[in-house]
Amino acid sequence: MKVLILNAGSSSQKSCLYEIPDDALLTEAPQPLWEGKVNWTQDRSVAEIEVKTAGGETLHESIYGDSRQAHVTYMLYTLSRGTTKVIGQLSEIDVVGHRVVHGGQNYRNSVIITEEVKQAIAKLSNLAPAHNPAALEGIEAIEKSLGDVPQVAVFDTGFHATLPDAAAIYPGPFEWVEQGIRRYGFHGISHQYCSARAAQILGRDLASLRIITCHLGNGCSLAAIKNGRSIDTTMGFTPLDGLMMGSRSGSIDPGIIVHLMRQSDYSAERLDYVLNKASGLRGISGVSSDLPQVIEAITQGNYRAQLAWDMYVHRLRSGIGSMLASLGGLDVLVFTAGVGEKSPGIRQAACEAFGFLGLKLDPEKNQNNPVDIDIATADSTVRVLVIHTQEDWAIAQQCWHLLNR
């Protein structure tokens, strides 16, 4: 079975092609046959296309035109044309899987995409304006290029559908619940993959483990996982809630928003920009939303950069503590995504606060670019894993299961 994956972002569209045996799902992620990416520059009419194959062929090209859908279609053509050709024709693809950030209340599981599903994704775009419209662009590009090939939507909110009401419902008027205003949670594909991978690495039954997964990238969230299910998470109604992030504020006193609207004449659009694009590491440090650049500024004595680091660590520790309370104990702590996988300093700072649990980090393992390994000491009562999140493979697995039911 040939499975094509599209993972849409606000400024990029990533894609890869897997070949999976029809009769048995592989236990570990295989190398994709082909990987493609469209990056949009500040000029919307210019797209940077990057393609590489398992055989080592690469393509870097700039293309012009106002249609993002056309740019994605061009990227897909490189699957069956030119030096990056890995299949004879696009019709060889059996199924296409899409990461869809927001599925709302109605989509708890992966589904075959229909017109009804597309309309629901579009309707939820106001809750994920940077991502749901981009997912629709990818879906429509596939319809144009591959016709009626089955397409599957895998929702980032789906894994958190098991949150108990006490964790999911906000303490506002009950009318909010009736309006669908609740904690949905995000990064669910990553949290679910990493919890299952942690159990696999440790040789343990997932249902027996109490796990906290820390997805720390430009966007950051934690999940508390018990019996293989999400029972608490830090992101909420939107991906703006929870931890301090690269350019997002995370949780703040809602009274600040009321104050700014009254005293400073902030519009909804300006608030949206400030909280999503000009806060977090970027807003506090004044340097960057990228943690390595903030760390570099710290070495040069930049006070605001140091403050940004300290706040990031404080809020991460507080979030882990909150998840710990929901679980009633902890067996495994997982770090994943760009910061989680690549920043030994953040892992060390986070773990230092939980020595009272008997958690002990192995300094050498932590510093040695760990991937899919346990970096706790042998006598630590909590296992600490660094896992390379593979959302694309997790989506491919969902596609395989749907088509083999």
From Swiss-Prot:
Record-annotated site: Transition state stabilizer: H187, R248
Cofactor: record remark: Mg(2+). Can also accept Mn(2+).
Active site per UniProt: D156
Protein's pathway: Metabolic intermediate biosynthesis; acetyl-CoA biosynthesis; acetyl-CoA from acetate: step 1/2
Gene3D superfamilies, alphabetized: 3.30.420.40
Protein name: Acetate kinase
Catalytic activity line of the entry: acetate + ATP = acetyl phosphate + ADP
